[in-house]
Amino acid sequence: MNKTVVVFGATGKVGCYSALHLKEVGFDVIAVGHRPSDNGFFADNGIEYISMDILDQDTYNKLPQSEVYGVIHFAATLPATMDGYHPKVFVESNIYGTMNVLDYAVKAGVERFTYASTV
């Protein structure tokens, strides 16, 4: 049985390439993104895609709750993509969202957690 890795922020450039590489080297990968659809990109590459908001704790039930080897967290709100200056939105997504991802990882019993950010 292959080890499972959940990649948050998989619809971003770094997250996407990371998910593809992990699949290529033999991991089972679950790609998580905020976009409602990945237009079949991940499915075409043998990767499950789950759309969710990392701020909504109820959506974490879409993810496996055990037997997750690793979590890689790239999800973030980029200031350059925001319409105007909204520090509350930035803090909620990047701080509280990360706390939710960490909480999920602890509850799922992951062995490895990686957090990377270009923000």
What residue ranges belong to the model's regions?
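N-terminal Rossmann-fold cofactor-binding loop
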Residues: 32-36, 54
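Conserved Rossmann-fold NAD(P)-dependent oxidoreductase catalytic core, especially the SDR/UDP-sugar
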Residues: 96-119
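Residues at the starts of beta-strands that form the adenosine-phosphate
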Residues: 4, 28-29, 111-112
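A hydrophobic alpha-helix adjacent to the NAD(P)-binding/active-site core of NAD(P)-dependent oxidoreductases
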Residues: 49, 90-91, 105
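SDR active-site strand-loop-helix element
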Residues: 8, 32, 71-75, 113-119
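N-terminal Rossmann NAD(P)H-binding glycine-rich loop of SDR-like oxidoreductase domains
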Residues: 5-25
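Rossmann-fold cofactor-recognition segment
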Residues: 44-56
